[in-house]
Swiss-Prot record:
GO terms assigned for molecular function: DNA-binding transcription factor activity, RNA polymerase II-specific; protein dimerization activity; RNA polymerase II transcription regulatory region sequence-specific DNA binding
One annotated GO biological process: negative regulation of DNA-templated transcription
Name listed for the protein in its UniProt record: Twist-related protein 1
Any one GO cellular component localisation term in the record: nucleus
Composition skew (Basic residues), residue ranges: 34-43
Record localization: Nucleus
Segments of skewed composition (Low complexity): 1-18
Oligomeric form and interacting partners: Efficient DNA binding requires dimerization with another bHLH protein. Homodimer or heterodimer with E proteins such as TCF3. ID1 binds preferentially to TCF3 but does not interact efficiently with TWIST1 so ID1 levels control the amount of TCF3 available to dimerize with TWIST and thus determine the type of dimer formed.
Highest taxon, organism lineage: Eukaryota
Amino acid sequence: MMQDVSSSPVSPADDSLSNSEEEPDRQQPPSGKRGGRKRRSSRRSAGGGAGPGGAAGGGVGGGDEPGSPAQGKRGKKSAGCGGGGSAGGGGGGGSSSGGGSPQSYEELQTQRVMANVRERQRTQSLNEAFAALRKIIPTLPSDKLSKIQTLKLAARYIDFLYQVLQSDELDSKMASCSYVAHERFSYAFSVWRMEGAWSMSASH
């Protein structure tokens, strides 16, 4: 019976069934390998994603730490930006002040010019007044009087005229002629002046 079974020919149907059963078994390992590869690749990709994500998270966490170098760099950058902004603001202020500086300079120049003009006018009028006073006051040829000396001499001349008016030495005829009276007063004042200067020098 054993020989009959072993030697019995296998029917084509049985062969096709056995082949069909073997084919899924043969096809399963590659699919399993592919699935394993896909799973491994997915795990690797997930792990890789988690890795950079973790690194990124660590970078962010490190940035939040007060003593981290990243925060120091960011602080420097922000400080640099702030300094640039302040510098820009300063530049803007400089431009505005620069726009106003020429106007103020022109105003100062105008004020200086006006002050110089007023000073020249005052000096000119003062010189003219002293020149007129020197024409009235009898002076000696050797006189080179300054302004203060001219004022002192004018005060002495007024004192001399007061003394002459108080005295009765001049008659009415001499007083009636203005030119002669002026020459007489001038000569008398010159003599009086010299005597006063001699007496003052002798007293000292």
